């Protein structure tokens, strides 16, 4: 939590036009610590979830998340958002291939490139972010990234 408080102070002077958060519980908690006041333009986006590789990367269904995090809008999430929307036995881990992860990163880059907002914060995960910036960040470390706007 101390890391999130430090990051909150570092980011306090930035007027973000859009905030994006992964739907994994740990990220929603981190997001809430960094941005404690509700911000109008916040999107919970499954594209920025972690690489599905371990049990900690398995998500929860939107109706369950909504009860725990009522200030977020989960209406754009499908029931099995952490498994590329494919139904599964929730007690199993269907690992995501690196190829599938990279395809998801490309879809995110395409999505971000068509946004009108210029100042965007993305609260996501190490492996996902590393596939964009080509190195790993420490917990609660931030990096400024300039996407290839067309």
Report each predicted region and the residues it spans.
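Active-site-proximal alpha-helix that buttresses catalytic centers in soluble enzyme cores
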Residues: 1-44, 50
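Short, amphipathic alpha-helical "lid/cap" segments that border enzyme active or binding sites
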Residues: 4-8, 102-109
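Alpha-helical structural signal in soluble globular domains
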Residues: 10, 30-37, 64, 68, ...
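An alpha-helix initiation/capping motif
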Residues: 21-28, 59, 99-102, 106
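Short, well-ordered beta-to-alpha junction loops that form the rim of enzyme active sites
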Residues: 21-25, 47-48, 77, 123-127
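Active-site-adjacent alpha-helix immediately C-terminal to a catalytic or transition-state-stabilizing loop
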Residues: 28, 39, 105-150
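Phosphate-handling substructures
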Residues: 34-103
């Amino acid at each position: 939590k101390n890391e999130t408080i430090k990051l909150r102070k570092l980011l306090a002077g930035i007027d973000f036009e859009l905030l994006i958060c992964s739907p994994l519980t740990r990220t929603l908690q981190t997001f809430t610590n960094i941005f404690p006041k509700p911000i109008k333009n916040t999107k919970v986006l499954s594209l920025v979830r972690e690489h599905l590789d371990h049990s900690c990367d398995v998500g929860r269904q939107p109706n369950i998340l909504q009860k725990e995090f009522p200030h977020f809008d989960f209406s754009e999430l499908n029931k099995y958002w952490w498994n590329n929307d494919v139904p599964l036995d929730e007690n199993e881990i269907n690992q995501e291939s690196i190829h599938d992860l990279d395809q998801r990163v490309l879809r995110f880059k395409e999505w971000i490139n068509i946004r009108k907002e210029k100042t965007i914060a993305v609260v996501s995960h190490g492996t996902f972010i590393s596939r964009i910036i080509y190195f790993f960040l420490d917990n609660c470390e931030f990096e400024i990234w300039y996407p290839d706007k067309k």
